[in-house]
Amino acid sequence: MTKRILMLEDGNYFIGDAIGSEKETIGEVVFNTGMTGYQETITDPSYYGQIITFTYPLVGNYGVNRDDFESINPAVKGVVVREAAEFPSNWRNQITLDEFLKEKGIPGIAGIDTRKLTKLIRKEGTLKGILAAETANKEELLHHLRSVRLPVDQVHEVSSAKAFASPGDGKRVVLVDYGVKSSILRELNKRNCYVTVVPYNTTAEEILAMHPDGVMLSNGPGDPKDVPEALEMIRGIQGKLPLFGICLGHQLFALANGADTFKLKFGHRGANHPVKELATGRVDFTAQNHGYAVEKDSLIGTDLKVTHIELNDETVEGLAHKEYPAYTVQYHPEANPGPSDVNYLFDEFMEMMNGKEEGELHA
């Protein structure tokens, strides 16, 4: 089997077996601790520009099917696994992981010590990495890697170029696409919403002209400070419409209300993150995928209150506006992959939109 190298910007490197596309690629190396859900993870637009390391030792054992995509065209730069299953077994399986990666033009590497790599990332933080042929000159690879600046304005690359509708007979929801997962749209469809998906740079005036019952801010990749267009829009609609944000949408909501965000050392990516609801003490296990978080101290003096925290590191995981019907979560209530413990948040959004009809808004 052809050999491949994963070179990190600190000079560490790993040599393993090449899987997927043969092309060379550079990205931010991160790790995901989920035991299952690799198809949903690889196709999640929030992983734009990243090389994903799966910590679970066997990946691809149930293959890839046509139903579990979170986007049609994956935005990941590469995949790192300990072992890629060659002979998957599942009644829904259609192609192997290797075949899928080749089809989508995603390079990968297998047969390396992913535990060692994960511990390195935990110690040093996320690092730039390059996947290349094992025969490449290591000094030249390292020099090239260190000279490359990872892309910003990532949301622009994964957001819908034009608005489109997903019809339903119920509430009318505008879903602002910062890199939305298909599962979020499906959750709204399950509740019979008429969903209009709009590009990330849609203005408040354009949204209000659609006369929706509520607005949802989607997940997405990158630094929330790279999306200044969103902040003015959020300020223009909060108080006028019920608002619900997820992941990047949560961070943008915080910035729009005067709080700050920061980059986590190695992020939260997995399906087993415990989150506590402060009002009730309830603890749920959640699916998470974020490299940035809201700075807790920056919330002092704002109109936002913390509703949820992550129990491992006390990261802010939920916010609510003190006056307006608006709340956000850092985790993923739609799951996919991960537990569906917090799926009820979509129902709370529906109830909030019902409150709009009953005249409960403050605007």
UniProtKB/Swiss-Prot annotation:
Keywords: Amino-acid biosynthesis, Arginine biosynthesis, ATP-binding, Glutamine amidotransferase, Ligase, Nucleotide-binding, Pyrimidine biosynthesis. It comes from the Bacteria. Pfam families: CPSase_sm_chain, GATase. Residues 1-172 are annotated as: CPSase. The keyword NADP does not apply. The keyword Ubl conjugation does not apply. Gene3D superfamilies: 3.40.50.880, Carbamoyl-phosphate synthase small subunit, N-terminal domain. Belongs to the CarA family. Small subunit of the glutamine-dependent carbamoyl phosphate synthetase (CPSase). CPSase catalyzes the formation of carbamoyl phosphate from the ammonia moiety of glutamine, carbonate, and phosphate donated by ATP, constituting the first step of 2 biosynthetic pathways, one leading to arginine and/or urea and the other to pyrimidine nucleotides. The small subunit (glutamine amidotransferase) binds and cleaves glutamine to supply the large subunit with the substrate ammonia. This is Carbamoyl phosphate synthase small chain. It comes from Listeria monocytogenes serotype 4b (strain F2365).
